[in-house]
Swiss-Prot record:
UniProt-listed Enzyme Commission number(s): 3.4.22.15
Protein name: Cathepsin L 1
PROSITE patterns: THIOL_PROTEASE_CYS
Residues cleaved off as propeptide: 25-109
Signal peptide extent: 1-24
Any one cellular-component term (Gene Ontology): lysosome
Catalytic residue positions: 135, 265, 282
Enzyme class: hydrolase
Cited InterPro entries: Papain-like_cys_pep_sf, Pept_cys_AS, Peptidase_C1A, Peptidase_C1A_C, Peptidase_C1A_papain-like, Prot_inhib_I29
GO BP field: proteolysis involved in protein catabolic process
The protein's role, per its UniProt record: May be involved in extracellular digestion.
Primary localization: secreted
Protein family membership: Belongs to the peptidase C1 family.
Length: 314
């Protein structure tokens, strides 16, 4: 293990010594992420979890199988996989949702598309949902902000908190999870506040009905039926997608290919490489992954083709 700049990073080309001073590594990690625990018992538990996660990453790099991605001890290093899932992977897929069947034969044959690096678009900074299961709101707002710029040449910084607090009648549940299509329905019916008027708090609150909601461009939404249609759609706009993000906890860089199709997290598809790898905008801050993004292997990796959708704007 080595320190790479300010980041605690396990390099897959480096043999990990059994003599690593885990205690010092843990102290450095706590300093970087400003971690303080309430009592000695909690401190001991978090140290054990940190050690377990260190061993997990160590085993990943010691595996003889060649990996296409890298892992690191990031801001989630003191969370067990169960705690991580309970806090961050709370997407609520409606029982009525029609999920697309997996297509293992899909192969992308187009050119690279990257909405994060397009001169026609002012790409918004990656946001952080914090310890609130509001990924669905960030997925919806991300698609709205970027697509409104692409399609209408209008720039907004919209309020995820408006969705968290106010879209309960649309079967969303704030920090306990929700669904992107339901968020689009709410915005179509009610408009959406700007972030400056309804700032994000990372917790459930009472709906502020008196706040102005000047964003009124959503006329509905369109569900995408296949990987082929998803590949066509990303040529013209970004897409809200549902994925399995269980293996994403310690992701640092590269193309991730191993995951299930158990949909538990909402994100935004913002590009596709010429080799078919998908580029995803996440909501765990810009220090996570590749400047807040992750790349997934082409096809229906992590269930990305199961339930994509985008807002219809006007």
């Amino acid at each position: 293990m080595m320190l790479l700049g300010a980041s605690l990073y396990l390099n897959n080309t480096q043999e990990v010594s059994d003599e690593i001073d885990t205690a010092n590594l843990y102290a450095n990690w706590k300093m970087k992420y400003n971690r303080r625990y309430t009592n000695q018992r909690d401190e001991m538990y978090r140290y054990k979890v940190f050690t377990d996660n260190l061993n997990y990453i160590r085993a990943f790099y010691e595996s003889p199988e060649e990996a296409t991605f890298t892992l690191e001890l990031n801001q989630f290093a003191d969370m067990s996989q169960q705690e991580f899932a309970q806090t961050y992977l709370s997407l609520k897929v409606p029982r009525t949702a029609k999920l697309n069947a997996a297509n293992s034969n899909f192969q992308y044959k187009g050119a690279e598309v990257d909405w994060t690096d397009n001169k026609k678009v002012k790409y918004p900074a990656v946001k952080n949902q914090g310890s609130c299961g509001s990924c669905w709101a960030f997925s919806a707002v991300g698609a709205l902000e970027i697509n409104t710029d692409i399609e209408l040449n209008r720039k907004y910084e919209l309020s995820e908190q408006d969705l968290v607090d106010c879209s309960g009648p649309y079967d969303n549940d704030g920090c306990n999870g929700g669904w992107m299509d339901s968020a689009f329905e709410y915005v179509a019916d009610n408009g959406l506040a700007e972030a400056k008027d309804y700032p994000y708090t990372a917790k459930d609150g009472t709906c502020k009905t008196s706040v102005k909601r000047p964003y009124t461009h959503v006329q509905g939404f369109k569900d995408i039926d296949s990987c082929d249609e998803l590949a066509q759609t990303i040529q013209e706009r970004t897409v809200a997608v549902a994925v399995d993000a269980n293996p994403w906890q310690f992701y640092r860089s590269g193309v991730l290919s191993k995951c299930t199709k158990n949909l538990n997290h909402g994100v935004v598809l913002v590009g596709v490489q010429a080799d078919g790898a998908w580029k995803i905008r996440n909501s765990w801050g810009s220090s996570w992954g590749e400047a807040g993004h992750i790349r997934l292997a082409g096809g229906d990796t992590c269930g990305i083709c199961a339930a994509p959708s985008f807002p219809i704007l006007g």
